């Protein structure tokens, strides 16, 4: 029996409790999603070719019979969160002459992003974001706040930078996992490329700074095969990669110099760094495009936070990303006014911001 109350203070208190508990237990939704990804639930439903019943799914996943009820409860939460959809299908257990139906589960747009082998699969993003190294550091946040040291939370918790962690043990697979996650995210850019073709039209050369294994550059090269593209990253990242006549891989240090080109692409780069280091990258980018005169440009793909957008889910994601960048790299996601100052301080004359990819922006910067 529910308690009744006419007091607004009590009602406010109950709503406050719900709000608090929801955020405290948000990790459960994240971990349930991680479990679904690791089990390959989306793959099974996709390969099934139609909505799948709970017994069929449990059988395909080779679960112990005692876990069928547990699977149902996981699916109940994930369905509530929009990752699966419930429907009904004719029951295989119906008696002769009787039509019976049972519940079945179908993919939704978010869970389709977990189907492995698809160009838009983001399973590696889930795996990387929820990796123990990304989560365990938060246990040290109280100590970190009280330290008089310029360390990231990751460094304070582990004793090493995230980049050192990635590179120290190639056999652990953490570097390849990170590169796979970045490549998966880059595939989403293919959808946006159709809308921003004009940004690359008229260019003869492009250097993708911090371009990793070249996921984005290859997409651009497919659309503009005449464009001479260079993927510029750390030597250990690009050292064993090969391209072709119009696509090459070059190792180096973006804080020292950047290969010359008509345009410099900085996708998911500047948010890794604080303003001082981002300014150095932008100044080196300006120098790299100087040979093109006023027709050169820098193309930034990053988040531009707009708390006044009215889209709470979008803004929350952007603010979450900001804390990820802060705690792991001492980087930041920037508001429009912060982008404006950074671009101006680097000596550029103008810029243009265009929202793309749902929660990111494409920022064209002109000398």
From Swiss-Prot:
Alphabetical list of PROSITE patterns matching this protein: SAM_OMT_II
GO molecular function: 2,7,4'-trihydroxyisoflavanone-4'-O-methyltransferase activity; isoflavone 4'-O-methyltransferase activity; O-methyltransferase activity; protein dimerization activity
Induction cue: Up-regulated by elicitor.
InterPro entries registered for this protein in UniProt: COMT-like, O_MeTrfase_dom, Plant_O-MeTrfase_dimerisation, SAM-dependent_MTases_sf, WH-like_DNA-bd_sf, WH_DNA-bd_sf
Enzyme class at the top of the EC tree: transferase
Enzyme Commission no: 2.1.1.46, 2.1.1.212
Catalytic activity: a 4'-hydroxyisoflavone + S-adenosyl-L-methionine = a 4'-methoxyisoflavone + S-adenosyl-L-homocysteine + H(+); (2R,3S)-2,4',7-trihydroxyisoflavanone + S-adenosyl-L-methionine = (2R,3S)-2,7-dihydroxy-4'-methoxyisoflavanone + S-adenosyl-L-homocysteine + H(+)
Residue positions of the active site: 271 (proton acceptor)
Binding residues for S-adenosyl-L-methionine: 209-212, 233-234, 253-254, 267
Function as written in the Swiss-Prot or TrEMBL entry: 2-hydroxyisoflavanone 4'-O-methyltransferase involved in the biosynthesis of formononetin. Can use 2,7,4'-trihydroxyisoflavanone, (+)-6a-hydroxymaackiain or medicarpin as substrate, but not daidzein or (-)-6a-hydroxymaackiain.
PANTHER family cross-referenced by the UniProt entry: O-METHYLTRANSFERASE
Record-stated family: Belongs to the class I-like SAM-binding methyltransferase superfamily. Cation-independent O-methyltransferase family. COMT subfamily.
Name of the protein described by the UniProt record: Isoflavone 4'-O-methyltransferase
Organism of this sequence: Glycyrrhiza echinata (Licorice)
């Amino acid at each position: 029996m529910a308690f009744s109350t006419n007091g607004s203070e009590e009602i406010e208190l109950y709503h406050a409790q719900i709000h608090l508990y929801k955020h405290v237990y948000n990790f459960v939704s994240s971990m349930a999603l991680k479990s679904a990804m690791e089990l390959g639930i989306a793959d099974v439903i996709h390969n099934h070719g139609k909505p799948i019943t709970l017994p069929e799914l449990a059988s395909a996943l080779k679960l112990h019979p005692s876990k069928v009820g547990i699977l149902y409860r996981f699916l109940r939460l994930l369905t509530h969160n929009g990752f699966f959809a419930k429907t009904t299908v004719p029951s295989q257990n119906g008696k002769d002459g009787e039509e019976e139906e049972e519940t079945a589960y179908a993919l939704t747009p978010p869970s389709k992003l977990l189907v492995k082998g698809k160009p838009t699969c983001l399973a590696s993003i889930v795996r990387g974001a929820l990796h123990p190294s990304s989560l365990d550091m938060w246990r040290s946040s109280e100590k970190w706040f009280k330290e008089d040291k310029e360390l990231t939370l990751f460094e304070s918790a582990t004793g090493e930078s995230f980049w050192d962690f990635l590179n120290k043990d190639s056999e652990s697979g953490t570097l390849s996992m990170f590169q796979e996650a970045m490549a998966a995210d880059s595939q989403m850019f293919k959808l946006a490329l159709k809308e921003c073709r004009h940004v690359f039209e008229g260019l003869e050369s492009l250097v993708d700074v911090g371009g990793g294994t070249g996921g984005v550059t290859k997409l651009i090269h497919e659309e503009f095969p005449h464009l001479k593209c260079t993927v510029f990253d750390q030597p250990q990242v690009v050292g064993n990669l090969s391209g072709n006549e119009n696509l090459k891989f070059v190792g180096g240090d973006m804080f020292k110099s950047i290969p010359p080109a008509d345009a410099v692409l900085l996708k998911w780069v500047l948010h890794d760094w604080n303003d001082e280091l981002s300014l150095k990258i932008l100044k080196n980018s300006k120098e790299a495009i100087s040979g093109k005169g006023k027709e050169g440009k820098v193309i930034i793909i990053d988040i531009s936070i707009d708390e006044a957008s009215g889209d709470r889910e979008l803004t929350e994601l952007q603010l979450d990303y900001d804390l990820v960048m802060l705690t792991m790299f001492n980087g930041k996601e920037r508001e429009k006014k912060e982008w404006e100052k950074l671009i101006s301080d680097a000596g550029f004359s103008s810029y243009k911001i265009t929202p793309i990819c749902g929660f990111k922006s494409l920022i064209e910067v002109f000398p």
